[in-house]
């Protein structure tokens, strides 16, 4: 009897072990779930998202195969971004990809007491946003890529196009840390290029058109930041500037396509791809987000729109036809 009981116990133990082993294997081999929180609808952020998925795919993590994507766009509403991050935490996703600074900060706050890593992209100043330390290291289980503007290169380009200009206007959102720090950078170096920076702060997308109508009376041109609220309302800025006959300079290629005259900007698809490769390392257990410094693309590229320049009677340097990384002969409004 004792032998039969012992044999039964061994059998049950082995079965339990096998079941446990199967469960572990399923856990190890199951696909990943990533919650993507994108703050607003505009081309550069869309390109980041597409690049992010492409970067993951190049590392063997492909949507529809071993990756499930839960995508939410906050429509430039901070409260929606915060709710989205909390929902992702409740769903226990494997990772949150946060696109743009407001989404990144809300995701970081929501995951602070969890083990869910956050990978961000299109954050202009991770240090100012509280997502990284001064040396570039992470403040927690979060890392990503930075889209800091090449301010000096942008101002030099504006000077080349507008040799007699003195005042450059910037409209920015007062609640976006990335915009505040970039404005400060413009103000710090503007005199080196013979410019004065004129700023107007807004708190909501509905204020952008009014700010633009007032701004065009005071400046020779407007230069955009990667400000999510203002970029989402870009057509309002362009409408007022075109009526006044002054150029608007973009901060990336999608703004130039949409009607800005030119930009020394980043390629956001490539930025997103770089982010996707960082995310793959974390998902595969090859690195921890907390141990990874944020990364950036250091070299800007020249983008020009000859149709946008012609619309306001502005002649661009002839060399731009060959020097530009990409040029456009039509305006493709978003």
What are these regions (language model features)?
Residues 70, 74-133, 227-249:
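Beta-alpha junction/loop-to-helix N-cap segments that form part of ligand/metal-binding clefts
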Residues 281-334:
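Hinge/cleft segment of the Venus flytrap/periplasmic-binding protein
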Residues 177-246, 250-252:
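Pocket-lining segment of extracytoplasmic ligand-binding domains
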Residues 125-167, 266-287:
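Hydrophobic alpha-helical segments within soluble ligand-binding/sensing domains
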Residues 1-33, 58, 62, 334:
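Short, low-complexity disordered leader/linker segments with a strong preference
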Residues 33-59, 70-79, 175-179, 228-232:
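Extracytoplasmic "Venus flytrap"
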Residues 60-81, 141-142, 187-205:
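Short beta-strand elements in bilobed, periplasmic/extracellular small-molecule ligand-binding domains
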Residues 34, 52, 143-190, 293-309:
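An alpha-beta-alpha
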